[in-house]
Amino acid sequence: VRQSIAVANAAGLVAGYALDSLLGDPRRWHPVAGFGRAAGALERRVYRPDRAAGAAFTALAVGVPVLVGAAATVGTRHRPLGRAVLTAAATWTVLGGRTLRHEATVMGRALRGGDVPAARRRLGHLCGRDPSALDEPELARATVESVAENTSDAVVAPLLWGAVAGLPGLLGYRAANTLDAMVGHRSPRYARFGTASARLDDLLNLVPSRLTGLLTVAVAPTAHGDRGRAWRVWLRDRDDHPSPNAGQCEAAMAGALGVRLGGRNVYFGRSEVRPYLGDGPRPEARHLKRAARISGAVGLAALGLAAAYPVTVGRLAGAAAGSVLRRTAAAGTAVAGSVLRRTAAARAGRRGGGGR
């Protein structure tokens, strides 16, 4: 049964990825959008401008999806087909690879056609920057950076957590990532309340972002990129970004495309100056299609790793954990039996001594 469930988990991840690639995000009744509305309602009820309230909000908003995933896992522990179907549905729900590549392609088409106003209107689908004063190179840079970071957030990380932790991992990761987008940014309202959500998202993306960087280096030639240059830029610049994770993805993408990312980012009401990543010219419209191609190749590579995990490493880890638990239980039983026997012998000795 354990082997069948492992195969079902892997098959569900592959099927969910295929659904996302073919259909993209659901146009109506998207579960993630529904979660966002529920989380927004919860925030309005529990909000206080302190970290304790934010931690409680994060624990509840992430804990419920994790418990739902755990209940579904228990309910399908002897039903491989049911597990595969639920895993496929959850994977499709939490992935955003097709939508990400589509937005990059649309932005590239608008910029190549000289329609900067249309590109500015479209930028909100990718990031939260203020597009009103951005020219073509800055719009292209914002798009490349968003594609790089969201390849990790919307593709690699969900697949990785789905492989390692199954349904609870898929749902819990997407919940945490959604909360980070809602309350994890720097603003007067969320400076303290959003700390827990931001830190949790950083923690959950530590490994996926680095894997995304490595995979971006590996697949750079699929978009006529230089693997050696991508490797050098990634090693040199990945830790210069203020985010512990975004720089991993953006530095690798900058090296793969041969462009320079970073600079001044303007948001609504504030601006940030980021270190430069890469050595080339500023991105142009022609780079967006290549960035989308790299994102797709990284997603396929991550899928291969994720699908292999449940039937290889995960299976071995499960067997090892089961062996440890069985040995621990056997040792505990032996110790308990020995203690009981000694106790019984001591009591018998006391009764015998009293009789004499």
Where are these regions (language model features)?
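Short amphipathic, positively biased membrane-proximal segments
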Residues: 1-356
